[in-house]
Amino acid sequence: MNSRNVILLLLAAAAGGCASGGDAVFETAQSFIAQGKGIDDAKLNPNLRYLRVTISGRVVLLALGYLDAHPQGTIEVWYSAEREVVRLQNGRVVGAVGLTSEWRNVLLPELPEWPKLAGGVEPFRWSRTRDVMPGYRYGLRDTLSLNTIPPLEKSALKGLDPKDLTWFEERFADDGLSKAALPTARYAVQIAGGQGVVVYGEQCLSPQTCFTWQRWPAGK
């Protein structure tokens, strides 16, 4: 596997942070290459936060660049070694740049918190708008249906028991009749103390561009 595809990197330099933070990320990356370790065994900088991502048969680490305050929940901005950027809000993708398919200007409504959604009997319907590149498709409106599902028996989840998490499935409410319809998204949520944190997700940006992500190291 190409070492450039499996090193983690990023942060302060690209996110406008201090030089020392950026140096720390690069030093970690250089050490990782030198040791030739796989991602799952890599010694990570404890001062940084990571996502373990699988995409197109590759496993990569993304580093948290910064947090963007938002009335509907903090947006986490994550970077890869290839300068790909993924934005997550409450576990949902609200931006992706640098991949073969890109989402921009994603708008979400104010959504119930995950514990409340977990207690729902009926599927929860909601709408999202997004701009998609390439193709210059602006203002695509998706009507989605979210419901709980049994823990997945097969997934890219590592280091956690699927049965300890609450699982959700998110489908296009029109059963895929829309030209913009995408494969099903899934979320694994850790619920404790009345709070819910998405620790694992499966998302497609297009029918051909799908990835999984997990907060890493597992359980941190």
Task: Describe the residue ranges of each PLM region.
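Acidic/proline-rich low-complexity IDRs
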Residues: 7-10, 107, 159
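Surface-exposed beta-loop interaction hotspot
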Residues: 106-118
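Bacterial N-terminal signal peptides that target proteins for export
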Residues: 1-7
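Acidic, serine/threonine-rich low-complexity disordered tracts
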Residues: 19-97, 104-105, 124, 129-220
